[in-house]
Amino acid sequence: MSEEAFIYEAIRTPRGKQKNGSLHEVKPLSLVVGLIDELRKRHPDLDENLISDVILGCVSPVGDQGGDIARAAVLASGMPVTSGGVQLNRFCASGLEAVNTAAQKVRSGWDDLVLAGGVESMSRVPMGSDGGAMGLDPATNYDVMFVPQSIGADLIATIEGFSREDVDAYALRSQQKAAEAWSGGYFAKSVVPVRDQNGLLILDHDEHMRPDTTKEGLAKLKPAFEGLAALGGFDDVALQKYHWVEKINHVHTGGNSSGIVDGAALVMIGSAAAGKLQGLTPRARIVATATSGADPVIMLTGPTPATRKVLDRAGLTVDDIDLFELNEAFASVVLKFQKDLNIPDEKLNVNGGAIAMGHPLGATGAMILGTMVDELERRNARRALITLCIGGGMGVATIIERV
């Protein structure tokens, strides 16, 4: 691959909470179209005929999100019919996978300008609506020793010795960092308010946040997944594989796990030549990407091998990275990643994450990549690494460099 892939723009919607949230009446297609419209406002001279493809991650591609929502967004937004559209699904990392795929297309020289991102309306299309062998088919569950992610998160905490106090302390940090970032205007460049067809404001902030969260309040919450474990026998399945563990300590609650929310994100990826032709200013370049599999029973340990792989591919070390952004699916996932790679607090999830602001499955990867582009610019820093744990036992990681 001889071409470089540059990030020219990275925007997102605010995240609306699932229950009685502000975005529950907004179609996921409308969230994406709104972002395309914003790109037009920011780049009025952009020749959209040069955009060869739109790649969107979406984890539950049924109902409002079915039928290739990326192509629907191209047509509904009035983009040229010559621009393609494809929806992809790598579970929680779908948004980052879309960006990585776009970068690979550009670096191959076969595409010059691609829009990538993701969308998930979890209030309109509940998680699991698309079915699937893993989780719903008893025979497959038996063959692959299926265990829900939440049980895997509690298993990580048990094996690593993370207490309830440890995961709650991390959750409190997430809320505090997110509140600080919002009050400091750190997201102002990338967050695009959602408006109705009359232009009236629907949502302009991440409404899942709880800035008034306290250590004492978190401690009062009951474990969220102990009942699921008992009902489905999932602890027993996990302990068949991890037989040296006597009992799983269920430490995760609604307060130290990622929030269920709605949202979308869009990133413009292109070659240097395309940017020059269109008068676009590159903000960062994609240095390297990597994907890794991991044990599907504990499931959520993939970020560590994916990170080691992408660092090796880029010829870099942990010390060469200024900022790390790991999706906060569950607090124990972040704590283990930090422990594995010896990452200092001041480099990790510096503006909070999904515990505070929510995890709109298909969009999150693109969202947190955009967060890192903004933060590198704000700090005048050089490199960031973005990674997510993934259902089925996988990890994806991407290194970007400010230009």
Curated annotation (Swiss-Prot):
GO molecular function: acetyl-CoA C-acetyltransferase activity
InterPro entries, alphabetized: Thiolase, Thiolase-like, Thiolase_acyl_enz_int_AS, Thiolase_AS, Thiolase_C, Thiolase_CS, Thiolase_N
Active site: 92, 359, 389
Entry EC number(s): 2.3.1.-
Post-translational modification remark: Pupylated at Lys-189 by the prokaryotic ubiquitin-like protein Pup, which probably leads to its degradation by the proteasome.
Alphabetical keyword list: Acyltransferase, Isopeptide bond, Transferase, Ubl conjugation
PROSITE patterns noted in UniProt: THIOLASE_1, THIOLASE_2, THIOLASE_3
Entry annotated with the keyword Transferase: yes
Family: Belongs to the thiolase-like superfamily. Thiolase family.
Entry protein name: Putative acyltransferase Rv0859
Organism: Mycobacterium tuberculosis (strain ATCC 25618 / H37Rv)
Gene name per UniProt: fadA
